Amino acid sequence: HGLGWVWRVMMFDALPSNLNIMPLYLVLLGGFPIFYLLMRIHRSLALLLSGALWMLVNMDPGLNFPNWLDPDGWYFNPLAWQFLFALGLTASAQTQRRGRDFARVPALVALCWVYLLFSAIQAFPWTLWGLPDLRPLGDALAPSKSWLSPWRLFDVVAIFYLVQSSERARRWAAESWVGQELARVGRSSLEVFV
């Protein structure tokens, strides 16, 4: 009633589920100067504090920004998703400082592939396809997007490491038409999402 809803929308207090991705970007960009300052003091300190906040939110998902439309708060909890942002900034700073991407450690590559295979089997909708449920952990594992559960974070980190440590993947991304188009989509991810 009245124009109270306008104020709620402008203050990001009325966000329908998946539509708070834009406000999430704004909050992350607004918090960037703080993270950058912490990185200038000590890169490990910045990552440690960011990781501690992420872990706190994973232990208590109720720690979230308020949302008038959803009593659980923002669908994409900025207090959790900031850690992925922090990991990306730290990885970028690290590779820029070294002048190259991550070293390819065979044991770590194997671990990433094994985890991603497990993740694919666990996430596949077996019963929707009329197949027997082959998920190793069944319903016991339900990774949340809202507070960036560890399983979702591991997915992203494993894929990131496999790409950033592979000369072949970098060459494919730089030289192939598909790789260049994917890079173009990535540079315009907000517009693509909207």
Predicted regions mapped to residue ranges:
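Alpha-helical transmembrane segments and their immediate juxtamembrane cytosolic regions
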Residues: H1-V194
